[in-house]
């Protein structure tokens, strides 16, 4: 007898279904994405669907896809909330290794839900890079999608800001910027816009690694498209063209990354006086009147640093790419930082 369908899944379609999100009578989650790519997730892990493959174009074997078993994980306390679900720490019962377990509950077959699931599962299947949080496996159980992620033991940039009231050195800011923009360069080469770069989605660990997380609202451009119109992400970090609902592209992430690095430097949101007033903030960003007043900052920054941030916050037409930002002179200061020393600094408590 097929397993009983949880009440939360009653809105989802049973196969066959021509698009979107569906489940089979054996409780397999089916996500049909753009271009006809189909991704299937079972209770035991990701299963290959028609047209699915790894980044290199070769299907992944069951041994690779199912190397972590759900039953071997002990799920613990909550780490935080992502764009589409909550994240808890999980520990492997046999090895003791820690993971971050993201779980997403379902509320029906909407375009946003399909896009979110496709983005999350695409990361599990294909997005592998030194500056992107790794995804190891996914499970569909009891009406939830569980995704096993790399555990970043120093937390987010928000956590680092809280732990270091003395502030970040400019060398450390350059180091974080270099790693963040390397990750963005990789994603953009995959035709992917992250769309939610902010301090909460840039993570660190004791190895000194900086990685981008949370792909719940990421958008992959296809079919020769270089722009999109869809509105997803966190409003305070959106670029002017996104606030104005204009077509936007990869360098919208550059604006968000610039604000993220500036927030690490200032220990507060760069346009802090406007943040509680969302309408006024949107107006200021859209009109170009939201500016950083460098003279009001207690900490004095180099001309290099100020230029770097201002380049990120240029209008869309003249805003550089991630590759161009990596050639900026500020990035050279990152070589002054030893990754292991960075990891020790990042893990230090107040």
Curated annotation (Swiss-Prot):
It is found in: Cytoplasm, Cytosol; Cell projection, Cilium, Flagellum; Nucleus. GO terms for cellular component: cilium; cytosol; motile cilium; nucleus. ATP binds at residues 79-87, 102. The keyword rRNA processing does not apply. GO terms for molecular function: ATP binding; MAP kinase kinase activity; metal ion binding; protein kinase activity; protein serine kinase activity; protein tyrosine kinase activity. InterPro entries: Kinase-like_dom_sf (IPR011009), Prot_kinase_dom (IPR000719). Pfam families: Pkinase. Disruption phenotype: Homozygous deletion mutants grow slightly slower, but have no significant morphological abnormalities. In BALB/c mice, has reduced infectivity, which is characterized by a delayed and decelerated development of footpad lesions. Its cofactor is Mg(2+). It is an enzyme of class 2 (transferase). The active site is at 196 (proton acceptor). It catalyses: L-tyrosyl-[protein] + ATP = O-phospho-L-tyrosyl-[protein] + ADP + H(+); L-seryl-[protein] + ATP = O-phospho-L-seryl-[protein] + ADP + H(+); L-threonyl-[protein] + ATP = O-phospho-L-threonyl-[protein] + ADP + H(+). One of its GO terms (biological process) is protein phosphorylation. Active between 21 and 40 degrees Celsius. Keywords: ATP-binding, Cell projection, Cilium, Cytoplasm, Flagellum, Kinase, Magnesium, Metal-binding, Nucleotide-binding, Nucleus, Transferase. The keyword Nucleotide-binding applies. It comes from the Eukaryota. Its EC number is 2.7.12.2. Signal peptide: none annotated. Can use both Mg(2+) and Mn(2+) in vitro and shows higher activity with Mn(2+) but Mg(2+) is likely to be the in vivo cofactor. Residues 73-331 form the Protein kinase domain. Gene3D superfamilies: Transferase(Phosphotransferase) domain 1. Protein kinase which regulates promastigote proliferation in host macrophages, thereby playing an essential role in parasite virulence. Belongs to the protein kinase superfamily. STE Ser/Thr protein kinase family. MAP kinase kinase subfamily. This is Putative mitogen-activated protein kinase kinase 4.
């Amino acid at each position: 007898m097929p397993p009983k369908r949880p009440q939360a899944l009653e809105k989802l379609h049973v196969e066959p279904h021509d698009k979107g999100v569906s489940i089979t009578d054996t409780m397999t989650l089916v996500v049909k994405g753009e271009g006809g790519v189909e991704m299937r997730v079972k209770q035991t892990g990701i299963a290959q669907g028609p047209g699915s493959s790894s980044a290199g174009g070769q299907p992944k074997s069951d041994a690779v896809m199912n190397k972590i078993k759900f039953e071997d994980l002990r799920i613990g306390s909550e780490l935080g909330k992502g764009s589409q679900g909550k994240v808890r720490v999980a520990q492997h019962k046999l090895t003791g290794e820690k993971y971050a377990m993201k779980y997403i509950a379902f509320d029906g077959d909407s375009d946003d839900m399909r896009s979110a699931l496709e983005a999350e599962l695409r990361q599990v299947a294909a997005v592998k890079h030194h500056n992107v949080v790794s995804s190891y496996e996914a499970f569909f159980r009891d009406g939830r999608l569980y995704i096993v992620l790399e555990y970043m033991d120093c937390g987010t940039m928000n956590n680092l800001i809280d732990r270091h009231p003395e502030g970040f050195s400019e060398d450390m800011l350059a180091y974080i910027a270099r790693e963040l923009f390397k990750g963005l360069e990789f994603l953009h080469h995959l035709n992917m816009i992250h769309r939610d770069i902010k301090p909460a989605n840039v993570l660190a660990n004791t190895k000194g690694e900086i990685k981008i997380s949370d792909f719940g609202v990421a958008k992959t451009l296809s079919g020769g498209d270089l722009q999109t119109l869809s509105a997803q992400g966190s409003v305070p970090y959106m670029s002017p063209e996104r606030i104005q609902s204009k077509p936007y592209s990869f360098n919208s992430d550059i604006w968000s990354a610039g604000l993220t690095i500036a927030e690490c430097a200032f220990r507060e949101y760069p346009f802090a006086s406007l943040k509680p007033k969302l309408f006024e903030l949107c107006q200021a960003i859209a009109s170009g009147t939201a500016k950083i007043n460098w003279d009001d900052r207690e900490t004095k920054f180099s001309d290099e640093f100020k230029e770097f941030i201002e380049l990120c916050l240029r209008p869309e037409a003249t805003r550089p790419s991630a590759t161009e930002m990596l050639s900026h002179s500020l990035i050279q200061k990152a070589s002054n930082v030893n990754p292991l020393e960075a990891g020790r600094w990042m893990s230090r408590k107040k």
